[in-house]
Amino acid sequence: MAAIVAALRGSSGRFRPQTRVLTRGTRGAAGAASAAGGQQNFDLLVIGGGSGGLACAKEAAQLGRKVAVADYVEPSPRGTKWGLGGTCVNVGCIPKKLMHQAALLGGMIRDAQHYGWEVAQPVQHNWKAMAEAVQNHVKSLNWGHRVQLQDRKVKYFNIKASFVNEHTVHGVDKAGKVTQLSAKHIVIATGGRPKYPTQVKGALEHGITSDDIFWLKESPGKTLVVGASYVALECAGFLTGIGLDTTVMMRSVPLRGFDQQMASLVTEHMESHGTRFLKGCVPSLIRKLPTNQLQVTWEDLASGKEDVGTFDTVLWAIGRVPETRNLNLEKAGVNTNPKNQKIIVDAQEATSVPHIYAIGDVAEGRPELTPTAIKAGKLLAQRLFGKSSTLMNYSNVPTTVFTPLEYGCVGLSEEEAVALHGQEHIEVYHAYYKPLEFTVADRDASQCYIKMVCMREPPQLVLGLHFLGPNAGEVTQGFALGIQCGASYAQVMQTVGIHPTCSEEVVKLHISKRSGLDPTVTGCUG
């Protein structure tokens, strides 16, 4: 035993990490990688255990290939960590949608009395109960992913991987043990993490991000959300919806990259339903008070004046950065965009190194959306191992922002269509409508709005659809198929609606912005 310990110790007397080299046949991984034409350990190695990476790995395994996944979650600055599944499962789509649902249920409970239900008021929300239920569901998904990998004989390594050369990575697990892996093909699918404003004193010490909010055991209380991204507005929306005092501070326009008329309606609805907005403001300092509350100092950019407010929680939602900095990409020869550190890829998802690929949020110019990463991952595996040549189509990708009044869209925004084709060649059909469910409950529907962006010349190809209202994701998904197939305005108008639904208002759009007529829908059977 003493001899083993002595062998593990170097001249410094410290323990060296053990290296476990996985082999195929008699040659080690490092030898296989360095020898020209040497056998590799795996047909495919996926770095990153998020939605895109797992989809790619499972598809390749289904096609009979030897596959490995290397995944490791670096705890957030607040110490939050989670299991296999990536951002969407753990700190994104899934917990966000469930907490959004919790907020919607609060509104339904308030509506219930209008429908004859005798509900004691005021209704109280229990953050602990909600958080525990959401976290338990997330953990079940973590376990499900592990089982799926095992069932498909995908080798899983919980290691922080980085490149040694273009065919080899090494990774360190949380115990400090080093594992070295080689593969013929490597897919980078490491995703991204929330950005901290390092120029704001106290931001890192006292703030949290979307990596933390869904794993809080106690209610965040009075919350300041800093940012104008969809993450900022979604989080602020459900926090307000469950009864918390919530303020959004944003430097410039909300939902940059989305249709700006729709973005304005989203924030108008949130503001009219209790979320406060500090527009054109930037934080400069956060300090913790003796009461454990956070005192935030900010500047109004228009006036140059400073102001101060006190909050229980500050949530940063100012954007995301790709997880590429610790991959040692230069050792593999993989090129990144120096401005944002995203990996440059071609239509095949290939990087500057032909057998190394990148998919999902880490890839330059790709939508940061779970479904696109999943589809791109599956198609990549099919091209590599299934004799397919089908490329991912990144045009007309639908998405939904799960704010209190949901915003679904597919295709071009009005601004994009005008910039691409010119104002004189664009026709926009639009309508304000009131969901039937809002009528009895006497809910405000002034921001429920639809617009369809079309070419003006026949056959009036539909370029984009924008829907603001209940169940926007469900509505948009169906129309996305038509737009992907090249539907015209005339074809949409020939479609019979399902009555009474919100989605039928799309197939009844007949007033154009150019006409100047009132777009408000009156009656329910017109």
Curated annotation (Swiss-Prot):
The keyword Disulfide bond applies. It holds the Pfam family Pyr_redox_2. One of its GO terms (cellular component) is cytosol. It is an enzyme of class 1 (oxidoreductase). SUPFAM superfamilies: FAD/NAD(P)-binding domain (SSF51905), FAD/NAD-linked reductases, dimerisation (C-terminal) domain (SSF55424). GO terms for biological process: cell redox homeostasis; heart development; hemopoiesis; protein-containing complex assembly; response to hydrogen peroxide; response to hyperoxia; response to oxygen radical; response to selenium ion. It is found in: Mitochondrion. One of its GO terms (molecular function) is protein-containing complex binding. The active site is at residue 499. Belongs to the class-I pyridine nucleotide-disulfide oxidoreductase family. Homodimer. This is Thioredoxin reductase 2, mitochondrial. It comes from Rattus norvegicus (Rat).
